[in-house]
From Swiss-Prot:
Main location (coarse class): membrane
Gene: SWEET10
Provenance organism: Arabidopsis thaliana (Mouse-ear cress)
TM segment ranges: 6-26, 44-64, 71-91, 104-124, 132-152, 166-186, 191-211
Induction per the UniProt record: Induced by the pathogenic bacteria P.syringae pv. tomato.
Protein name: Bidirectional sugar transporter SWEET10
GO cellular component terms listed in the entry, alphabetical order: plasma membrane
MtN3/slv domain: residues covered: 11-96, 131-214
Taxonomic classification: Eukaryota, Viridiplantae, Streptophyta, Embryophyta, Tracheophyta
Complex and partners: Forms heterooligomers with SWEET8.
Cytoplasmic side: 27-43, 92-103, 153-165, 212-289
Extracellular side: 1-5, 65-70, 125-131, 187-190
Annotated function: Mediates both low-affinity uptake and efflux of sugar across the plasma membrane.
Amino acid sequence: MAISQAVLATVFGILGNIISFFVCLAPIPTFVRIYKRKSSEGYQSIPYVISLFSAMLWMYYAMIKKDAMMLITINSFAFVVQIVYISLFFFYAPKKEKTLTVKFVLFVDVLGFGAIFVLTYFIIHANKRVQVLGYICMVFALSVFVAPLGIIRKVIKTKSAEFMPFGLSFFLTLSAVMWFFYGLLLKDMNIALPNVLGFIFGVLQMILFLIYKKPGTKVLEPPGIKLQDISEHVVDVVRLSTMVCNSQMRTLVPQDSADMEATIDIDEKIKGDIEKNKDEKEVFLISKN
């Protein structure tokens, strides 16, 4: 018995929901760390503000379209999760970051979404509403999928995949596959097309990870700390280590006669100080007895 397109769309929608559910929960370790340390530790709220906007946009689209329940379920969940993330970040962030977060939320999530809602609901005719909103969602989704280009460029430039978590790339690629088939089976190119690009970039990221992966290397750039700052600290440590090693191993390094005489004088002086301290200690003990 042939399976209908509607049933297949539901199956891929459920699979997409399950995978996207875990992707939404991926930042939990970050916020557990923020909660335990009572500090945002240099993390930024921008990704979560953008994710909140995306969830609002796709929820609105699914409600207008009326036959995309799977989009409503996952984006409703994402909406709640992103609000929790932003709230936790705001609570533990310094004053400057709090102000910046409020500005982003007002500009992107309130004014941005508000403008789209007014345009599509009150200005655009009902017959064109879904089409126009679909184009807006598609353009936004494409811009989000293009975002990893910065990471890809960084991996190629540094020839290191330490900035690119393979697991997240894999699940995002898998999610793109599920939502592509969901959109294709619903004959909705606004859902399907952006996920083609998402799949391509996801596969590219995994290939680059396998090419530039360094076995045993788990060095990651902590949020809020630049590699330049780390390298400066490393240089200082190397200098300090060099000074210690030189002082301990000077007798192994060839020296000219002047240096040797100076070294002997210093050593004799140190020995004399030790003997003097020893004699003073003995005199102190005798006088005490």
